[in-house]
């Protein structure tokens, strides 16, 4: 009887204490800004111990939770929460490929490319054979942020880790082109064309078509840039525009006067100094839908 009474009293005390603790926690919670409520992911060091060796299981659990709840928070803090969450997930399971991919996808929605690249760099360092993470980060840099230097960095990593995939060389060549490195881009396209000149597969034909288009375009861009630079140098030196392009060669401003990829001379407007190509590449007409 006494034992039963003691047990009941103990339960009553525990209940009273828990109610009091709950009230204190609720009161404390009310003092936090709305965006900080109901969110706490422990540190990676803590979870590595608390997981009792089941790190992959806890990484999966936190990953599933993060997909459901991350968008409930204000933009001012949401991305820091998100980055912390995926930092913890990938600390628990560094090979969790989907965590890097989904984390970067969510971060890109708020255009937090700085955090996208931090998470991508972590994944690439911890997974030295993984090329998809580099490709993934490069696509955000190229297509969304339009940071072609950053895109080039990741596409080159992807191509180095998976040299047998010509599509990655295509991306490297395009990143060089959009960054303004026409000579490097031209070199890549020429290599691609040479590698696939006899490839009759659909992909091989596409790469040859793409290479032809870009070789034509880049050759023209390089020529026009070279001629325009010579025209500008002539104008600054002589105080007037040259009478014609041939005078640039005669007076030492150009070694030779290039022709366009079709072998035709470039056009020159004496009044404005503008230099243009008279045979733009009709790529659609030459290669149908390509």
What is each PLM-predicted segment?
Residues 109, 122, 187, 201-290:
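Low-complexity, acidic interaction segments enriched in glycine
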